[in-house]
Amino acid sequence: MLFFLLEDPFVWNFPLLAGLIILCAIYIVLLRTYTEIKIYDKQPLLFFLSLTILYITIGSPLSSINHLSFSLHMIQMSLLFFVIPPLFLLGIPEASLLVIKRLNIPFLAALVTFAILFFFYHLQAVLTYLSLHSYIHNSYLLLLMVLSLLIWQPIVTEQNKRFAFLSGIVLLPACSLLILSGLFGSGTNPLLSGMMASLCITPSALNSLSILPPPFNTRADLIIAGLLMMGIHKFALLLTVRLKNKILARDLTGSG
């Protein structure tokens, strides 16, 4: 069954790949025109890495696997909102980020909005509805992605420890929802149900399928998903600080 989901060549998102290649080309031109940063320096490599992870996460056949269980889905969400944004922002020269800072964007409002939308996203009724309406689902995820970039901007540019701490606090409701659903809920996966519906597989047939072994698609899977989200977010914060310090050290020494 898993092989069937991955064998279709059309699950590769070639329009997205073309768009990312164009974005990389524009980045290289701007980098060579307005900065002295070399393509092989840390910042460009982080920028390219962020786009590579983005494509693997949502544009490759691996994106099909993310719907098979909540823990795999949460890894995808964590990469999209906690790993890719800081890598992307770290890859942008400091002068450009300072221009964004001067716009006086209400980053705290973006953080609260993200937390609310992210919490509602993991309510079973909302997730069931979104899984059956792909355009609305993709628009919802795009909005969360934009908000996540705004959230990480003060953490990357200012190394704002207070804001970083708040970003972890506001994620607790969504993490707690998954963990409590695993402890007291049914353990059902609306994303998997939506995928099977698109393949014309009935609920009774779905129950008889063993796509992934335990603890996937069980209550334990929801608990693992909640813990994964907290762990990856914390890891992303620590990684961002470390990479930022290396970039600052490079700027001081003048080496790549």
Predicted regions and their residues:
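Alpha-helical membrane segments of multi-pass proteins
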Residues: 1-256
